[in-house]
């Protein structure tokens, strides 16, 4: 086993890569273990690509209401679902590459695979068994591979996963998680969004603007329950 890292971080999301960069800037020998995509869920399958989708929806809305702004648009306004999705994935991929650049610039080693803490101070990295989400971002260049790695300190920053509600298990067809909602083959005629947090409202807003009939189901007394009542109203 090579010389131990001062800090080894499991997870290359916003918690992991930011900690890694700061540790390296402070002079610590640092590595990040990632099994799927640098930048984590937020950058690849969360708030970043949803903002790109919402931007397309916003422009579509403005074009359909051009006359409200004293503008004239000839012909019918339409959209290409695959192009809308492709743009959002391109935005995500660009920022994903940016995370890889920042890690390289700050001399943080990137170890590609799935980590297991074997014992205190030792992490085993094996090829990931998790199927990659489609379309996947390319694996960054210059990474380290599977094997055993020693570390004086280990940070676990493994991020978020979709919640599964008993009896409403996702099948990727009729019942989606946010993964499928972000890369639809076509836009559904109707959609029920379970949960009115930030992610739920983002998807509800996007799909409704693009012409889908949307209903939001929330167990708590207000939408956006984690926010101020004034915002929820």
Roles of regions detected by a PLM:
Residues 2-5, 21-28, 33-187, 220-224, ...:
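Glycine-rich flavin
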């Amino acid at each position: 086993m090579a010389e131990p890292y001062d800090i080894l971080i499991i997870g290359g999301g916003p918690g992991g890569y930011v900690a890694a960069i700061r540790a390296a800037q402070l002079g610590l020998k640092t590595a990040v273990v990632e099994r799927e995509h640098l930048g984590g869920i937020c950058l690849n399958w969360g708030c970043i690509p949803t903002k790109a989708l919402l931007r397309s929806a916003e422009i579509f809305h403005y074009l359909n209401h051009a006359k409200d702004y004293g503008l004239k648009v000839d012909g019918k306004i339409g959209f290409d679902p695959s192009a809308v999705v492709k743009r959002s994935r391109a935005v995500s991929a660009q920022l994903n590459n940016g995370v890889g650049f920042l890690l390289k610039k700050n001399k943080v080693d990137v170890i590609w695979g799935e980590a297991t803490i074997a014992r205190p101070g030792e992490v085993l990295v094996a090829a990931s068994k998790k199927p990659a989400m489609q379309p996947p971002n390319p694996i960054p260049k210059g990474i380290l591979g599977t094997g055993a790695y020693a570390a004086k300190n280990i940070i676990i920053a493994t991020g978020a996963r979709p919640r599964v509600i008993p009896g409403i298990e996702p099948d990727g067809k009729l019942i989606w998680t946010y993964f499928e909602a972000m890369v639809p083959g076509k836009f559904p005629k109707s959609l029920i969004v379970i949960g009115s947090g930030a992610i739920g409202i983002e998807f509800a807003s996007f799909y409704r603007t693009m012409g889908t009939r949307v209903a939001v189901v929330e167990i708590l007394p207000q939408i956006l329950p984690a926010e101020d009542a004034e915002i929820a109203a």
